[in-house]
Every structure is written in C-alpha cells, then in structure tokens.
Amino acid sequence: MSPDTVNNAVIDKAFEDNAPLRKRVYSAIASTPEYTSLFEDIAKYATTLRSGLGRDASSACSQVRVAATGEGPAAKKRKLINGSEGAVAGTGAGSANDAALLAGLTADAELQFYVQDLSFAIPQRKKLRLELTRLVSSAAGAREGYLRARNQASNEVEFGIPMSRIQHILCLPVPEKTQRQFNFCIIPEHGDGISPVPDHQLAFEPIVWTIPDGPPRTAYLGSGTPALESANLAETYESYLKRMLDDNLRHTKVICPSEKEFVSPTPEAHRKGDKAYHVKAFRGSKEGFLFFLSTGIFFGFKKPLVFFALENIDTISYTSVLQRTFNLNITARSPAKPDEVQEFELSMIDQSNHPGIDAYIKKHGLQDASLAEARRAKRLNINGVKGGDGGTDSAANHAGESEEEESELVKAQRELEDREDEEEEDYDPGSEGDSDGSGSSSEEEDQDGDGQEDYDGEGKDLVKEELGKMISPKPQYQQTYNG
C-alpha cells in the first residue's frame, strides 16, 4: 500500500486539534505503509471516542494525546505514561504497536474484574477504581489485557499499563502499621530504576496501590457480581487480587515475601505477633524499606522505586560497617547496556539483619563483593578504626559454605586445618570462647568469622593463628558480632 492511498480526511479529522501528532502519524505511515490501515482504524476510533461517547471518553482520549505529544502541564503528562516522547513519534512497527497500546488503554473493552475505592500511592496519591480489561485486537485477533485506574467521579482513565508490559508484580506487607495492609507494586519494562528507556519506545510508570487485610468487599466481577458471592470464606483482598492477576499474566506471577528467603529478627513494631519481612534503609537522604524476594531485591515505597532483579545484580558488598549499622552496596547492570555498571548504596541498615541478608546472598549465588580484593582494604581500614564491629566478620561468616564461592584464602585455610588435624590429634578443644581477645590479623577475620562467632565449637584456633602469620603480622583486637 502506498501513502497516496491514505484516507487523509479520517486522519485529519481525528487529529484536527493536534497538528504535531497528525504530522507524526503521516511520517510513520510514510515509513511503514503496511500499517496505514491500522493508523486509519486508530483515527476512526479516536473520532468515535470524541464525538460518540461523550465528554468523559473525549477527555480520556485527550489524555492519550497529551501524553503522546509531550504537550501540556507535567502533572497531565504523567497521567498515562512516563517517557512519552516517541510514543507515536518513532517510525516502524514499534510506533504502530505503541499507538495501539495507548488506544487500548482507554478503550471500552471487556471488563474482567474491578475493585472500588483503592488507595493509590504511585503515580498519583488518590482513591481510584482498579480495573482489569481485555481487548481483542482487530489486526491479529490477539487479546491484550490492561490494568488501569479510573477516576470514579469523572469516569476518566487516569493511568494504566498493558499486562504485556509488566515485568514484575510484588505483593508486600506495609511496614510499621497498626493494622495489616499490603502494597501491590507493578514494575513495568524499563521501570525498575536500573534499565534505561530505549529511544523512541513507550514506557509506563510503576504503579503502587494499598489494600487492607480483610474480605474483598469492594471487589466485583466484570458482570458486576460481588466477588464475595463466589469467593470462599477465607478469601481476602490479597488472595483475591493475587489469584485474578496470576490468571491474566502470561510471563510472570505475583511475588510475595517468604520466610525461606528472608525474615527480620525484629518483629513488626506495632504488631509484635507478626514477622517483619522488611529492612529499613536509606538511599541518600530518602528513607525506605528493603525486601529480599525470590526474584530480586526491592526498595520502596517512595519514588523512585528500585527493583534489583537477581539476574541484573553484578556484585554486592558491605561497606561503612559500624558497631550498630552497615551499608549495602549493590552493583547492577542493565540487560540493555551490560557494559555500563551502576552502583547503588543503601545505608544505615541495622546489624541485626546482617546474618539474614548474608544468607540470602549466599543462597542465590550472588557474588559477595565484601570478600573481593578490590573492597578488602577499605573495609579493613574501617574495622581498624572502629575496632568493635562484628558486621564485617559476619559478612564473611558463610564464605566456606560453597566450594564455588570460596576465595583462595579460605581454601588455603581449609588445607591448613587438615594439616593441623593430623598434627594436633592430642589437642583438647576445651571450652568455647577461650581464645576470645587473642591477637589475630584483620585479614583473617575478614575472610572467616567462624572462630570469632564460636559457631564451630573450637577453643583456641591454632589454624587461624598460623594463617594470620602467613597473611599479616599486624595484630588486631578480637571482634564480636553483635547480630
């Protein structure tokens, strides 16, 4: 098909009050004439929305137009998408697909379920109606799902995201609340705080809403039937939304915290009977909460959210280790730009959480950069000054758990232990803790904290003394981990 066969009247009418967008549509048609019919269908649909469905639908269409062109106030531009430049500006199949996604977001589509009066925190702080719709594409016959938030007063779609553009969905308990609540966090493609948005590609914002712990009284099926009529007696907002979202997701599932992954030794501050799955931390001056999940590490709940997928984490190290707190440095690489390394520092983490975090790192085979040569000197200097932090020793406490994770120093210690076992057969282990306070090198403490934490049941550790002589003659006060 040639651009000469374009129905100019249809496109001109649909975009008569938006010349820049009309120009971009014509540019895209000229570059990819095979999508001419699709752009005409979109134009017809936009015209129908504006003229046939009333003021509210016209306003929703206007939001798409504002977002796509980058015009209007910043608050209005954020309503549907972020990084909107290039939503229809680019050329090729991507531009056509993005335009179709934007149109589908506000389309009068089949409603799967909805929940009234949900409290949203991101990208807007207000109560809205959550909807899950499914639209049949006329081009390929495919069914695309959309998760969107509708203003219950104006009936406008405020923002949303196609289900196919969701990278991760998390259901996390809200910390430090007297009543149990949960935050559902939608992490879109290129919205994890690490991956940059490719040029001329549509990007959606993360979405966060809060639900109470109780029966889903404001949830309804698409037909309007209350969800409670078909739900079991134990159904809650959490279980209902998790089930409905999982049923409509093809490439991911809702992820919740698990005690198998991480649980804080300190219970919830206002609910002593509930376990806490979060760790309080700071990123710069911004306070937030860390969650260690089966698919990655999440930091929220204030903008900007950051989600470190396990596959994107390069290294993890402990720095600024003090007697009561330590910092966690996460080095990550974006799949789109694997050569570019980004480093994130999460500070002021309580020492009591160190064993659980360290176990999480080891479990998932993440490189513990606190044992790396490049980090060792800085951390030892901190230890020498502070003289009493046990966090550094605990950071390396499990270094020998896996043969693949052992450094050359730990392997050397194992060999020395074997030799000492043969030479000291008459040695009586004695009571634990006899060697506390004895001089040992800071290098040896950094590599293996087993002796100083008295986990192995040994008394005076001759192996460590020998190893300390091999590594560094400089003594250091014995440290005790306070976790």
Swiss-Prot record:
* One Pfam entry name: Rttp106-like_middle
Q: List the disulfide bonds.
A: none
Where are the compositionally biased (Basic and acidic residues) regions?
408-417, 457-468
Coiled-coil annotation reads none
Q: Name one GO cellular component term.
A: chromosome
Say which family it is in: Belongs to the RTT106 family.
Describe the subunit structure: Interacts with histones H3 and H4.
> What does the UniProt function comment say about this protein?
Histones H3 and H4 chaperone involved in the nucleosome formation and heterochromatin silencing. Required for the deposition of H3K56ac-carrying H3-H4 complex onto newly-replicated DNA. Plays a role in the transcriptional regulation of the cell-cycle dependent histone genes by creating a repressive structure at the core histone gene promoter.
The name this protein goes by in its record? Histone chaperone RTT106
Q: Which organism is it from?
A: Ajellomyces capsulatus (strain NAm1 / WU24) (Darling's disease fungus)
